[in-house]
Amino acid sequence: MIDQCLDVAEPVMRTSYPRLYASVDGDTHFQDVPVSMAPVVYLPDMPGAPLVDVATSQSVTALTFSRLEAGFDADWHPAPRRQFVLVLSGGIELTVTDGEMRSFGPGGVYFVEDTTGKGHRTRAVGTGECLVVTVAC
């Protein structure tokens, strides 16, 4: 099973994702969250199956595909729910109240949980539409 990691001294793969959160004063910030992965037998019924590096599973409540038109520009707003956003095509630019701005293109992943406070700005960047998947948790 995926959740049954092999006994290894330390994870073999590390990555991170940006988290967008609201501090107690209502301002928003980015924080890079580390993710550790360990090898698991992902296909246990397949003899000789290669190991796959996997992080701990997280429960999710909804998965939604969305399309942002070229020129989409949402002024300051809190996130509608705690969710990961995966950019499939196009690009997104997020700005938080401390002034930091980050851009995400195809393959980009970030987590928003600023469901209270001043929120963030979201813009579709580039000349075409932006396709995203949101995964609520």
Give the label of every model feature segment.
Residues D73, P78, F84-G105:
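A short beta-strand-loop-beta hairpin characteristic of the jelly-roll/cupin
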Residues G71-A74, E93, V109-Y110, T115-R121:
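Histidine-centered metal-chelating micro-motifs
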Residues V24-W76, C130-C137:
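A short glycine-rich, His/Asp/Glu-containing loop-to-beta-strand
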Residues S23-V24, T97:
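Short, ordered coil/turn segments that flank beta-strands lining enzyme active or ligand-binding pockets
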Residues V35-S36, T97-T115:
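Short acidic-glycine-tyrosine-enriched beta hairpin
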Residues F111-T115, V125-C137:
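A short hydrophobic beta-strand segment most commonly corresponding to one strand
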Residues V41, R102, K118-A124:
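Short, Lys/Arg- and Gly-enriched loop/turn segments at beta-strand edges
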Residues I2-A22:
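Short acidic, Pro/Gly- and aromatic-enriched capping/linker segments at domain boundaries
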